[in-house]
């Protein structure tokens, strides 16, 4: 009977030994001194390498959005000036003004993505990377100097536990320091991949790691297990990594990476957003207008400008927008060429100015040009009749003029002139038909029968410093500014320019 029992026991021992021989990669229950399996270490490092790049990715995204906003504000100013300087391209300039506004809004929305939880998640990624790197460097550093294959290590081969090549610097990328570059990596995918690692964290051999030694005996009394990385790994109280707990089983409730696993895909999508800008150069305009696909980007802005009534919107938008800009596939548009012909005096400081081509003007120059243009248009609008379509009768005009007693005020009206020799005070300011027909800035008139200056006579021959009060210095010549714009158009340009200045 005893012999049979001994034989049965021997068979059990042999079966266990056979199982260990056939499956050397399978770790036993936690064993004091066992190293972390290199497979698990590399999984942690792969995640860490991605996580530490998220701050660089965020910096890249914010820089793109900020640059797009700045350039689009410049494009907005450029379009506002074009609206004033190119009456024949009013719709083109207005379309680009609205398009630039949309681009500014897109850039602002991209920046606002990072005012709350998304930035916190990027911070969490960086924090988790730091935690992993330090643990991995600690484990890899606890090893016997010498060739691979020795068994005194805290980071060893999953099958056997022997020392492996050092890999933390490369796999975790711990040597980057402050030179980490953006790489558009997906933190959500990285967290998901880590959460799927099912390998037992404890290597199947080795017993020399001091970090995973028996906590209870080596420290006299250590009642609890030792969690690492918020519980992703756990050193058992009796030593070794806790059996039955892989990264896959620990990840769902792990606060270090669970939020990144659940929300990281959204963060990655926002980090990958590239905010484009409105055009500010001739080449950028060419790109935007040189193909049907690119021109389609202007449709929302053009629709907003036209506010089409039902049935009025062109069926072929591309044909319409090509006509608006004078555009052809692969060529500079007529609008872009017209902009190239505009030069404006820009202040240099100290009372000095410099004539600059519109494309070459910086935001500061464009702002000054906008302010000057608005002032010119306001002056021109103020000298226009209140109702251009209404022709006053002599009786109506005399009634209006006769109420004015001051000579300067009388002469400031485009249809009144002051007669200083008239003895009747009610008749000194009278209607001047010649002056009214010219519909230009007023001139002083001693007698109602004297001739008023025409717009051309008033401005022709004046030097640059004297070219003002309804005149405009353009192309080295003093010209009448009122012939360039009607009152209604002038006011619309002022409004558009003011809108641009508000952004």
Curated annotation (Swiss-Prot):
InterPro entries: Trypano_VSG_A_N_dom, Variant_surf_glycoprt_trypan_C. It is found in: Cell membrane. The keyword Disulfide bond applies. Glycans are attached at residues 113, 419, 432. GO terms for biological process: symbiont-mediated evasion of host immune response. One of its GO terms (cellular component) is plasma membrane. The keyword GTP-binding does not apply. Keywords: Cell membrane, Disulfide bond, Glycoprotein, GPI-anchor, Lipoprotein, Membrane, Signal, Trypanosomiasis. A lipid is attached at residue 480 (GPI-anchor amidated aspartate). VSG forms a coat on the surface of the parasite. The trypanosome evades the immune response of the host by expressing a series of antigenically distinct VSGs from an estimated 1000 VSG genes. This is Variant surface glycoprotein AnTaT 1.1. It comes from Trypanosoma brucei brucei.
